[in-house]
Every structure is written in C-alpha cells, then in structure tokens.
Amino acid sequence: MKKHGILNSHIAKLLADLGHTDTIVIADAGLPVPPGVPKIDLALTLGTPGFREVTKLIADEMVVEKVTAAQEIESVNPGQAAFLKAEFSNQKIDYIPHEAFKKATSQAKAVIRTGEATPYANCILHAGVIF
C-alpha cells in the first residue's frame, strides 16, 4: 500500500502514464464527459469532494505546463477563478469560451469528476515534463 500522495489507483495510474502535452480534466459535478473519454468519478455528494481539494492534490503530483479554463469562470465564479490564479501562479492560464472548453475535453486522457456544485469550476491541466 502507498504511504503518501494520491491513493486512488485510477488517478495514480493516470498521472504516471501522462506524457508531455497530455491533458486531464478536473470537472465539477455537471460537466458532460465526451464519449470515449474515461471518467474517474469521485463525486460522493454535492460539494464533496470539492474542485479546489481535488485540483490541489492533482497539482501536487503532476507537472503542469499550463491550464485551460472557461472564460466565464472569471465573471460567474470569481472565487474559483482566484483559486486557479493562485494555485497556478507559475503557469499560463488560457481562458476560452465554455463551449470550446467542452469540445477540448474530448482530447483529454480522462475526466476526474468532483462533487463541486459551483458554475464553471472546471479546468484542463496540460502535462509538462519533469526535466
């Protein structure tokens, strides 16, 4: 049994298998998952686990080169937008329209669904390299 870090075997394998520029999505409870993209469903109840908690844990174990979020998050959910800016202060954050964001999720290696119940609390994490 692992002693540290993410214990969820699906997420641990996903992170270990990522290559440079691969993407994963951290999603709120309502984001649709495109056909063919694996979903790792962590949602237990509305709000649990939350977007911030899951995003922080993933970011601690992943080399993140850049982040993509829906541009609507800045006006509709400024608290989550501020969290993303603080958490990824050393990475570029691209803001795109929500419809384009949903289309971009079709290229992800997986969608990790949280129980988050606030609007536009989603992000695409683009893998970097450790060297």
From Swiss-Prot:
It catalyses: beta-D-ribopyranose = beta-D-ribofuranose. Its main location: cytoplasm. The active site is at H20 (proton donor). It is found in: Cytoplasm. It comes from the Bacteria. GO terms for biological process: D-ribose catabolic process. Keywords: Carbohydrate metabolism, Cytoplasm, Isomerase. Its EC number is 5.4.99.62. The keyword Isomerase applies. Gene3D superfamilies: RbsD-like domain (3.40.1650.10). Substrate binds at D28, H98, Y120, A121, N122. It is an enzyme of class 5 (isomerase). It holds the Pfam family RbsD_FucU. Homodecamer. Catalyzes the interconversion of beta-pyran and beta-furan forms of D-ribose. This is D-ribose pyranase. It comes from Bacillus licheniformis (strain ATCC 14580 / DSM 13 / JCM 2505 / CCUG 7422 / NBRC 12200 / NCIMB 9375 / NCTC 10341 / NRRL NRS-1264 / Gibson 46). The gene is rbsD.
